Amino acid sequence: MLAVPPRFDVRSRPIETARLLLHPLDATDSRDLWNAVESSRAHLEPWLPWVPFNSDLDSSGRYAEASAADWDAARACRFSIRDRANRRFIGVIGLEAFAHLHESVELGYWLRTDASGRGLMTEAGRAVLDWAFGPVNAHRVRVAAATDNHASLGVIRRLGFRFEGIARQAERCNGRWLDHAVFALLVTDQRTIS
C-alpha cells in the first residue's frame, strides 16, 4: 500500500535540493500560483488543458485548496517548487492518481517560462522520485507527455523513465488532440539518471 506522509509534516520539513525547496501546495501559494500561470500562459496552454480554467486569483485559490484536500485524502501529493535562494515560486510538481492497492502513482509537473531551460524540473523530479520510492512506498511511477512536447520529453528521459508506448489522442488540449508518449519507472529499475 502507498503511504502518504502527513502534509503538515512535509510542510514543516520540505524537500530540499541544491537549488530548490518543495513543499505541499496549499492556499498560501494561491497568489504565487496565479502569477506564475498568468506570466507563462502562452507557454503552458499548448500542453496543459487546465490552463484556460485558471482564469483568476480565485480559481488558483480553489486549485491550491483542492490540492491540500487531495493530499489529506491520500489522492495526490502536489508540491510548490520554489527557488531555494530567494523563495520565488517557479512551478508545481506532484504525484497524482494514487492507486493504493497497486502502489502506483503518476508524475505531473510544470514550470514557469522564465525558469525553464536550467535543469530545475529535472532536479525537482529526481527529488520527488526519491520521495515516491522512499516514504510513499510507490512500486511504479507513470508519466506521459505530448509526443511533440520536447522539453517535457527531455525531462522524462533525463529522469531515467522507460518508454512504454504511445497513447493516441489521449488528451484534448487547446482545441487539438494530443498523442501521449507514455513512460514508467519501477522501484526495481536501475535509475540511470543523466
Where are these regions (language model features)?
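Acyl-donor (CoA/ACP) binding surface of acyl/acetyltransferases
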Residues: 1-32, 36-43, 78-194
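Short, polar/charged, Gly/Pro-enriched helix-capping and turn/loop motifs at alpha-helix termini
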Residues: 47, 51, 74-78, 139
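A short hydrophobic/aromatic micro-motif that marks alpha-helical segments and, especially, helix-coil
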Residues: 55-56, 71, 190
